[in-house]
Amino acid sequence: MEHDNAESIRLHLWADLAYQGKLLRFIENHDEPRAANTFSPQKQRAFALTAATLPGAKLFHEGQFEGRKVRLPVFLDRRPHEAIDHELPVFYTKLLEAINRPVFREGEWSLCERTGWPDNPSFLNLVAWSWRKDDERYLIVVNLSDFEFVSRGPILPAEAGI
């Protein structure tokens, strides 16, 4: 997500749902820079929400919930002292509670279209999808830019029933 824009991510999400369900979703791992060093706090949260609410397995890296910035070598047995982003664990606690609902594992996922006005392309920075199971429905809209957006709202696919 570091080098992709919302449109390239949205196009990736058009892939077959069976394929999407086999993917591993994460924003950091042991051999890449830490998310806290790569993204602004707002983008960290947007990308975490994205990775956590898409189909597929979710992976969270040690220290991600605290906003750790030091990438530890595999063989280091102790961690240096780091300042912690005290708001980030609260965010992740709420996110994990939300995605623990059965709808995010057993429900029907749909990619949503988004629309705007010809003279304001800021809606192109959005990616939107929905989850549905029985009467439970969730619409996730993520702004993947550093700027505010104007949108007429996602146009949901008919099969989403929302």
Language-model-detected regions and their locations in the chain:
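Catalytic cores of secreted or luminal carbohydrate-active enzymes
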Residues: 81-108
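Hydrophobic, well-ordered secondary-structure elements that form the walls
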Residues: 30, 51, 95, 141-143
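Carbohydrate-binding surface patches
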Residues: 118-159
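Hydrophobic alpha-helix feature that most strongly marks membrane-spanning transmembrane helices
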Residues: 31, 56, 100-103, 144, ...
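Acidic/polar loop patches that form or flank catalytic/metal-binding clefts of enzymes
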Residues: 58-62, 101-112
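Short, solvent-exposed loop/turn elements at beta->coil junctions and helix N-caps
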Residues: 112-118
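Alpha-amylase-like alpha-glycosidases and glucanotransferases acting on alpha-linked glucans and related
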Residues: 1-90, 120-124, 136
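Trp/Gly-enriched beta-strand surface patches
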Residues: 162
